[in-house]
Regions:
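Non-heme Fe(II) oxygenase catalytic core, chiefly the N-lobe of the double-stranded beta-helix
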Residues: 2-234, 239-268
C-alpha cells in the first residue's frame, strides 16, 4: 500500500468516551511516511491509546519499524505472564501481582526522561481475560474541581523505584504533579500508584490523604478503556496522556512483545 492510499483510508473510531481509538485503513507493512507519522502522533496525543487489529501475529521487525512512526525506539523485548515458567519469553517477569503491572502506572516516572510511549503486540493472547486497561490523565484532570486543579498545579511529586524490587536500576526523580501535552495543550495528571512516593512539601497526613484521593480518582471507570487481546492485536499508548494496568485474571498463557518509544523530560 502506498502512503497516499493509506492516508485517504485511515480512520479513527473511539472505543470509549474520553480515551482510546481503533485505527483502520493501515497495514503493519506500511513504509515510513512523514505525513502519516504526524497524523498518527497527533491522534496518539488526542486519544491517548490507539488499537490496531492486523489479523495475524506482528513480527518483531514489523513492530519495531511501526514504532518509528512515533519516535525513536528501544530494542524489542517480550514478556509472558502465565502459569508455566517454561513458556516465558523473558524470565524477568513471572507474575502480574509480583511485578505490580496490575496497578495503575506510567512507565519510568522515577527517571528524568520517562518513555514517551510503547507498542505492545500479542504473541500468544490469553484464552479469556488478561486485558490491558488504560486511563486518561487528561479526563481525570478535567474532572477535578477548580480548587483541586489549582492545588495540584502548584505541587511536585517524588517518584521512586525503591519500592518496586523488579526494577534493577534504582532511581528517584521529582516531576510536576500536573504536566502539559505539547500537541493538544491539555493538562495531564502525572501521579501514579506504583511509583509516586509523595507530594513535595506536604506533611505526612496531608500527603497520604491527597495521594489516596488522586489514586482513587484515577480508578473511576469513566476514564478507562480496555484492550482485550487476540491474535493480531497491537496497541500504541502515550505514556503521559494515559496510565495503564494489566488485568491479572485470565485463562491460558499471556505472551506480549513490547517496543518502548524514548521520551524527554515532562514539563508543566
Amino acid at each position: 500500500m502506498v502512503a497516499a492510499e493509506c492516508m485517504t483510508k485511515i480512520e479513527f473510531s473511539k472505543v470509549a468516551p474520553c480515551v482510546g481509538a481503533r485505527v483502520s485503513g493501515i497495514v503493519i507493512e506500511q513504509a515510513y511516511d512523514a505525513d502519516l507519522a504526524q497524523r498518527l502522533q497527533t491522534a496518539l496525543a488526542e486519544y491517548g491509546v490507539l488499537f490496531f487489529e492486523f489479523g495475524r501475529t506482528v513480527t518483531e521487525e514489523e513492530q519495531r519499524q511501526f514504532g518509528s512512526f512515533f519516535g525513536e525506539v528501544e530494542p524489542v523485548y517480550g514478556f509472558s505472564t502465565g502459569k508455566n515458567s517454561g513458556g516465558l519469553i523473558d524470565a524477568r517477569v513471572q507474575s502480574l501481582k509480583e511485578y505490580r503491572t496490575s496497578i495503575w502506572h506510567s512507565d519510568g516516572t522515577p527517571f528524568e526522561h520517562p518513555p514517551h510511549g510503547a507498542l505492545l503486540a500479542a504473541v500468544e493472547p490469553p484464552e479469556l481475560g488478561g486485558g490491558t486497561m488504560f486511563a486518561s490523565m487528561a479526563a481525570a484532570y478535567d474532572a477535578l474541581s477548580p480548587h483541586y486543579q489549582r492545588l495540584l498545579d502548584g505541587l511536585e511529586v517524588l517518584h521512586t523505584t525503591f519500592r518496586t524490587p523488579f526494577v534493577k536500576q534504582k532511581s528517584e526523580f521529582v516531576h510536576p504533579a500536573v504536566i502539559r501535552d505539547p500537541i493538544t495543550g491539555r493538562k495531564l495528571l502525572f501521579v501514579n500508584a506504583t511509583y509516586s512516593e509523595r507530594f513535595v512539601g506536604l506533611e505526612d497526613r496531608e500527603n497520604d490523604s491527597l495521594m489516596h484521593f488522586i489514586c482513587e480518582h484515577i480508578n473511576q471507570p469513566e476514564f478507562h478503556c480496555t484492550m482485550n487481546w487476540k491474535v493480531g492485536s497491537m496497541v500504541v499508548w502515550h505514556n503521559r496522556v494515559v496510565q495503564h494496568r494489566a488485568v491479572d485474571s485470565f485463562i491460558g498463557e499471556r505472551k506480549l512483545r513490547r517496543v518502548t518509544i524514548l521520551g524527554d523530560k515532562p514539563v508543566a
